[in-house]
Amino acid sequence: VWDREIPVKEMMEQALGLPVVLDNDANCMAYAEWKMGAGRGMSSLVCLTMGTGIGGGIVVHDRMLRGRRLSAAELGQTSIHYQGKTGPFGSRGAIEEYIGNNELAAEAVKRYAGAGIIKTVDECTPRHLDEAARSGCPIALQLWEDTAEMLGCLIMNLMYTLVPDAFIIGGGVAK
């Protein structure tokens, strides 16, 4: 944590000679997809980034959804299990407590151990789990099926709440 305010935006503008906007990755993804990508021409969309956590960027009626504190669309904090794991922000059952990179790896290690197979978290990255699933590994296949179910729960909640024109999914886990 920085102990003083650093004018990053102004420093970047001066160095680049261009206007700079600072935002989180999911909002930037949503804006780019809306203006130039898969969401071009749509008036509403939801972008989900799947990586270390689950991020979100939302466009509604041709406007980025920001919220009162500019922190709307923190979709990783959406609960999918009302009695689930308690996360670092105090919410229970937040989806990113189940399908973020680290959580997937930890769950895979646990499931492999239950089958008598010793794996480290470094051997259970999304890429490793993808390769294992493509090779027919039942543990990896079930883990991805469970991940898809949880992601589907989040998407259905968003669908019934926002009724967007599209959902666009990206990020390291999504690859």
Give, region by region, the residue ranges found by the protein language model.
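Short beta-strand-loop/turn "lid" adjacent to the catalytic site in phosphate-handling enzymes
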Residues: 1-6, 21, 166
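ATP-binding/phosphotransfer module of carbohydrate and carboxylate kinases, centering on a glycine-rich
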Residues: 9-18, 32-42, 64, 82-175
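Generic enzyme active-site microenvironment
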Residues: 23, 31
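Short glycine-aspartate micro-motif
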Residues: 45-49, 55-57, 168
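A cytosolic small-molecule/anion-sensing beta-strand core signal
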Residues: 60-61
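A short, polar/charged loop-to-alpha-helix boundary motif
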Residues: 71-84
